[in-house]
Amino acid sequence: MNPVNYLYLAALLFAIGASGVLVRRNAIVVFMCVELMLNACNLALVTFSRMHGNLDGQIVAFFTMVVAAAEVVVGLAIIVSLFRSRHSASVDDASLMKL
């Protein structure tokens, strides 16, 4: 398969994730869309790494996945805390957490 097709797929995944972040109000769905955008960037990094014949992009993508795993833990903890206090997972309620 042509490597350019992987870049098109990465752009499509990023666009889907960006539209989900802009349109949705549920914090879990927004969080999943952010992760989709992050995985699209990883796919582009690995594709460019493969096209240029070095491992730099793959190493960066690996470390990005490690950081994303930590982000998932912290992000879901915040969402669960928001849900327990407000009984809703809406991002509009997140601004009320400071009260």
UniProtKB/Swiss-Prot annotation:
InterPro entries per record: NADH_UbQ_OxRdtase_chain4L/K, NUOK/Mnh_C1-like
Family: Belongs to the complex I subunit 4L family.
Subunit details: NDH-1 is composed of 14 different subunits. Subunits NuoA, H, J, K, L, M, N constitute the membrane sector of the complex.
E.C. code: 7.1.1.-
A Gene Ontology biological process term: ATP synthesis coupled electron transport
Main location: membrane
Organism: Streptomyces griseus subsp. griseus (strain JCM 4626 / CBS 651.72 / NBRC 13350 / KCC S-0626 / ISP 5235)
GO molecular function, one term: quinone binding
Protein name stated in the entry: NADH-quinone oxidoreductase subunit K 1
Reactions listed under catalytic activity: a quinone + NADH + 5 H(+)(in) = a quinol + NAD(+) + 4 H(+)(out)
One Gene Ontology CC term in the entry: plasma membrane
Keyword flag Protease: no
Source domain of life: Bacteria
Keyword field: Cell membrane, Membrane, NAD, Quinone, Translocase, Transmembrane, Transmembrane helix, Transport
Function: NDH-1 shuttles electrons from NADH, via FMN and iron-sulfur (Fe-S) centers, to quinones in the respiratory chain. The immediate electron acceptor for the enzyme in this species is believed to be a menaquinone. Couples the redox reaction to proton translocation (for every two electrons transferred, four hydrogen ions are translocated across the cytoplasmic membrane), and thus conserves the redox energy in a proton gradient.
Transmembrane segments: 3-23, 28-48, 59-79
